[in-house]
Amino acid sequence: MHVGYIIAACAVVGLLAETQADARDIRLARDGKSEYTIVLSKDASPSEKHAARELQKFLLEISGAELPIATEGDKLPKRMIVLGDGKALRSLKVCIDFRDLGDEGFAIKSAWPHLVIAGGRLRGTMYGVYAFLEEVLGCRWYSSRVSRIPKKRAITLKPLDIVRKPDFEYREPGYTDAFDADWAARNRANSSYARLDEARGGKIGYFPFVHTFNGLVPPWKYAKDHPEYYSFINGKRKTEGTQLCMTNPEVVRIAMETVLRWIKERPDAKIYSVSHNDWYENCQCEKCKAVDEEEGSPCGLLLRFVNAIAAEVEKKHPDKLVDTLAYQWTEKPPRITKPRANVRVRLCAIFQCQYHPYEQCEKNKAFVERLREWSGITDNLYVWHYNTNFPNYLFPMPDLDELAADIPMYKRFAVKGIYAEGNYSSTGGFMDELKAYAIAKLLWNTKADAGAIRDDFLNGYFGKAGKPIGRFLDLLHGKVRAENIHGDIWDTVDAQFLSPEVMAESERLFDEAEKLADDPDVLERVKHTRLSLEYVKIIREVNKVGASGTPEEKAATLNRLEAFVRECEADGMMQLKEGCSIRARFEEFAQPLRK
């Protein structure tokens, strides 16, 4: 059972609770006063100290009561909120299996008149504090700028006995806003890209993140004198746009030395990526081809290469991990070689239909089978999932159904970590804040109600305007569901589901949302979300007028395009397309209008 399912049973907060309180209830605060002290152990970790400050801050904001923070001593306070393991916890004789909780699990337990929140020293106790604030007291952190902290005259708690662990060891919502340190910590995302410091428990850090062959054996350094280090293609060695010749023992040696140097230079990282470049061109020399044929997949040679490096890493740095990819030409698992225990393989779900749950979509059957095969040869599988439209970050991509079904699916296939790649390079993609929030919640607890998460976000983020925006999302998802329309991460503004009827109804719903927005900040968020519709309309106009418009029509469309881009810039957007500045993208669109 998860915290979200037992809120009503665990906490009754307010005057009614105060008047009907049982003798064993914990009366945490009333009328701006509290008898409780937040107690830390003498050797509290940085994240536990940060958790104490966060608990103090939000309890003050909720109730008006500022609880003191103390380090346990010979004499303990009469009423305590005990954070973490130590003398204070042991004095209460509360049973918590810290070994089972690991680094990130936690327990929230009543020990009347005391409250205990304790877990793994690295992040567990801190996560327990945020779970208490969120799921018991009603706090929400929807985005880095939008939160909901309730105001309560009294806080009275029914007995609590909660134990939680995350469903995935690595949880990364890949959106720019999700990299905010406080947002990531409060939503229990241990993201590599997040700006998480030691006080916030650190993170599952990668270095480098991906596509590292050129860094492992740099062509600029070796290609001139040693072309044999690189792919043999069509009868000759290729030293640009290439991969490595992984059967060459010198390549293995150099790559191994590079990884060991990376570990020395970046000891803060947990995982070091040994992954092929972002293209094909794998080596076709006789030795490499022989291994490929033996293994039934080029990934066999890749894993032999990665395993050799990982074996040396394990000898010198047993706490570090090595990562690689099952992507493009390495997606198919090998017949013979299996990843070592300290290797994480990221299976990339890049060529799938993103509009339907994978197990329910005929276009995704092959990937589901591939997932099944990989989970059969490693207990440490990661997945690289995709949650945006890369050439069109503002494209209204209807993938919430898919996310709600497939994150739990990954758990069923024993996946250990997920990087959900969204608009990682700029703010302002389609429903980025909602997607990041929902992904974070599902990565922690795959049994969470995705629909309830969505509705809670829409209500908290948009207020009264959230209902028509919810109907807009229902409209998009209902269209692709009812008509079995497929789409991927490169879909265009001419996508079939964006029919004239859908566009017209979407406009009506956003008109309604703008009228219901009763706060300037909410209205700004509604208008920002509406930019996705404006994007579809203006780019459709650009394509049509650019192809057959008169000079006057082209000039007018160019002016409207310029105005749209300026609005995006004013909203803080830096990119409309992956790897392309917003002004460079404007020039791409503007080119046919200037002919």
Task: Show which residues each predicted segment covers.
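Acidic, contiguous N-terminal accessory segments
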Residues: 6-12, 17-107, 147, 153-161
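Loop/turn elements at helix/coil->beta-strand transitions in domains of secreted/extracellular proteins
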Residues: 34-35, 65, 76-79, 113, ...
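Feature activates predominantly on carbohydrate-active enzymes
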Residues: 51-54, 58-60, 96-304, 314-318, ...
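Structured mid-domain segments that build the active-site/substrate or prosthetic-cofactor binding neighborhood
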Residues: 250-253, 261, 365-467, 471
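Well-ordered, non-membrane alpha-helical segments in soluble/globular domains
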Residues: 256-258, 296-311, 361-372, 398-407, ...
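Acidic, His- and aromatic-enriched active-site or binding-groove loops in soluble protein domains
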Residues: 292-309, 340-360, 438-448
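Substrate-binding cleft/loops of secretory-pathway carbohydrate-active enzymes
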Residues: 323-351, 394-401, 427-436
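Catalytic domains of carbohydrate-active enzymes that cleave complex glycans
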Residues: 414, 442-595
